[in-house]
Amino acid sequence: MSVPPDPDGRPWLLALHSSSESLGVGLQRLGAVAPERLETFPLGRSLSNGLFDCLESVLPASAWPRLGRLAVATGPGGFTGTRLTVVLARTLAQQLALPLDGISSFRLMARRLLTGPEPPGGDGPFWLLQELPRRGVVAGLYGADPGQPGGVAELEAPRLHRDREALAPHPIRPALVQLPEDVIQLLGFSGANAAEGRAAPWQPVLPLYPTSPVEALPC
């Protein structure tokens, strides 16, 4: 791929999402309102072997110095896929001295739902929930908030619950990744942060592991 020229010399915003069986990559000019490239790669367990090739098919390594900001979905998601993409994003941000926005995959889903035709919580908050066989449920609580980045408040970050009874009384929606739609949301979050001049150091950006083996199942 040849990188299209930009007469204003605006840098690129690159977004990576691997919290499902597929890798999503988005490329957008900082300050633009729409992505220039959106690609989905159904890599599954071969992500570790195909990650760099997929990234370079969207933006060649020779063009990485033209990046101005990075964004990555931090999960919850598969242990290996999420970890590899977050590590890659952190490495690029460190080596290129770029800001890095880490956004949970649940928060991206919430923004997609809130901007859809039927917001799931009406005027109030709602849960996003993922069922885990024999473990319980992973759920996060979200609501619309124009004062928050991307217009979405993460009222409770995704964590493990024994069952859905603890989630009353708010509405519950299934936590389902949709690509490339959720990559568009990731670009939107990061673009809004850039427009508002929000700092985004790479060091705090880490994968979310609600089902960590070192933590006991909630009572």
Regions found by a protein language model. Give the residues of each.
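Generic alpha-helical scaffold signal
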Residues: 45-49, 64, 82-86
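DPxDG-like acidic metal-binding loop motif
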Residues: 69-105
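A generic structural signal for ordered secondary structure
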Residues: 27-29, 63-67, 88-97, 139
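Short, well-ordered alpha-helices that flank and scaffold nucleotide-derived cofactor binding pockets
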Residues: 57, 90, 94, 115-116, ...
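Phosphate/pyrophosphate-binding loops at sites that engage ATP/ADP/AMP, CoA/4′-phosphopantetheine
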Residues: 55-69, 118, 146
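Short, functional N-terminal and low-complexity linear motifs
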Residues: 18-22, 58-59, 76-79
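N-terminal, well-ordered alpha-helical segments
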Residues: 49, 53-56, 86, 90
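Oxyanion-binding and handling regions
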Residues: 1-35, 42-50, 101-219
